[in-house]
UniProtKB/Swiss-Prot annotation:
EC assignment: 3.1.1.5
Glycosylated residues, chain numbering: 199, 261, 399, 451, 465, 492, 573
A GO BP annotation: glycerophospholipid catabolic process
Record-linked CDD domains: cPLA2_Fungal_PLB
Species this protein is from: Candida albicans (strain SC5314 / ATCC MYA-2876) (Yeast)
GO molecular function terms noted in the UniProt entry: lysophospholipase activity; phospholipase A2 activity
Name of the molecule in the record: Lysophospholipase 1
Reaction it catalyzes: a 1-acyl-sn-glycero-3-phosphocholine + H2O = sn-glycerol 3-phosphocholine + a fatty acid + H(+)
Amino acid sequence: MILHHLLILLIINYCVATSPTNGYAPGPVSCPSSQLIRSGSQGINPNEQSYINARYPIAKQALSKFLHNANLQNFDVDSFLAHSNPTIGLAFSGGGYRAMLTGAGEISSLDSRTKTNTPVLAGILQASSYIAGLSGGSWLVGSLASNNLNSVDDMLSQGLWELTHSFLSYYGIEHPIKQVEEWVNVGNQVASKRNANFNVSLTDIYGRLLSYPLLTNTEDEGDAYLWSDVTSASNFQSHQMPFPILISDGRAPDTTIINLNSTVIELTPYEFGSWDPSLNEFVDTRYLGTKLDNGRPTGKCYNGFDNAGFFMGTSSALFNEAVLSITEANIPSFLKDIIDDILVDPILKSNIDVSAYNPNPFFKSSGSNTAISQSKNLYLVDGGEDGQNIPISPLLHRNVSAIFAFDNSNDVLNWPDGTSLVKTYERQFSSQGNGIAFPYVPDQYTFRNLNLTSKPTFFGCDAKNLTSLTKDIYDVPLVIYLANRPFTYWSNTSTFKLTYDDNERQGMISNGFEIATRSSGSLDDEWAACVGCAIIRREQERQGIEQTEQCKRCFENYCWDGTIYKGEPLGENFSDDGLTNSATEYNSNNVAGFNDGGTSILKKA
């Protein structure tokens, strides 16, 4: 029996640590005979499409169970699903640990494995085809996917997401020897990549430090764990997890990007690239680090560049600057030397927030004659830097019927105000947006004062109203928007708050659960049914099926009707369903963690 368990452990370790060096540095491998670059015009990656095709029957069965449990009135679930294929995508915004923890509560509300007495939305995670995250949302999606898509309950019980100390010093002053060992190990790991003749940036150090709380259960905190290794996880092999996508932005040094000109880079376990006209190409994730010329290797091929922590760090590279703060601590001198050596590079010194992806895999690519393909170097930044802080863009290319957009951004007083949706809406009219349609949304003032950030809101409820955006109106997803707000915890913590004790952590997670479930269903006993109505809406429209009276009632309550608010601001406090000037409902007397602004780690200019 002991031997049997040892064999299982060996198999697991083999599956989850495929870096050829068995460490952080990439290593040489045999080159494949196939082309490593492909055009985005070919559509979804064949491996991804095969995964989705195999997963969909599983997801559809879970959707059937959810819809049956949602108590939809006068609606035959089985008959509808026999002729319809609704597809769900989940998108988790950036926002540091605020976004990760609130998002954890939100995803736990969708998970049928969560232990709860109020399973209002349980099963939607199992019914989803895609899950995307950027910046703090990438910490959530990346750590879950890298841990076999464990439930949030299991992540906590297994000791992950231990945030009592900052990821900059995971063990803290209480364990000085272990803390120095961590810094020594991180320094050695990053040095090994540099010694293998790969450029390193602050993201390499930051990504390794970040892996301590996020990849705690992997060997050596994930120094050899690759993002492409997710495909070897048992829940991926059995098609039990939504397909995970992380997001970053491409940015040339010393330039500024906005929603209209950014190159949105997808980091999936299979591919790395962008649908945007500025690139429109993808490379096999496993072979990042290989020098390519027009998609063909010019020398040795490498695997191991796609370290999972490095990828999560890339998506959240805003936090690179945090690494500079540890140079003031008692860290080993050679780690300081590595940081100093990185900053000798004038590009990396003046662009602290970039991640170096050198060599550029798209160099001289025949399919793209843009600034990206003409440069030997590729630099990526935080996925939210262009203002699109919810990773909706990749889902718009994957023909989903409904998108759950979880917005835990910092727009006003560390609360979201809809800016991310506004930026994604505006982008469709730019050359980079390439006409990929997204539903109408209002301005930020309307978002707040029509209470669209205080209770869930649906956008794109009627496809017939989208004809001025696209002729393919049924291909535009309905967006289910849920913004961070207080119910049981004042969850507007600073993006740069890097420590949470167990009570704070649980407070944030629990509040996220309440956001998604509408206070455990207490504010609307038809909330599950209304979510079901939103999920099935596009397929109903495609088939000319009229909504039930219940669904019409739901849409009356939750759909934005096109109104733009011009009146006086309603206030900054929260009621159950909106903003208010009153301080009698959600305030310091009855909600824990009141206005915990956290501590900024960024140096003031």
